[in-house]
Amino acid sequence: MTKPTVFKRADIQHRKDGLEDGGTYIKPLVTVKNSESMAGGVNFLKKVSIPWDLTCDEIIYCHEGNFRLMCDGEAYELGPGDMMLVPKDNHICYETDDECTIFY
């Protein structure tokens, strides 16, 4: 049986602290290396607009700041504690006007 894995924010906090405008840092935590059925990670974003094509369903949890997802010309806004489900095969855009941290 595989044991639980702990991920510490302190291990990647320096990446958020050094993020410049227009920057993003993605830290995949769950990948095919440690799971056959799921993916997930942390994404630090700062004043960005990033187009993205989803190849799998995605749940997004906004931990800090404000996050906007654009899909088919419609804006979906998240604040701290908000979540959304985004179905696969959508062409989306991650957007932030300031700093934001999401978990996907």
Mark where each language-model region is.
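Conserved short histidine dyad/triad with adjacent acidic residue
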Residues: 36-54, 88
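Short acidic-glycine-tyrosine-enriched beta hairpin
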Residues: 73-89
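Short, conserved beta-strand element in jelly-roll/cupin
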Residues: 44-45, 54-71
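Short hydrophobic/aromatic-rich beta-strand segments that constitute the beta-sheet cores
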Residues: 52, 69, 102-104
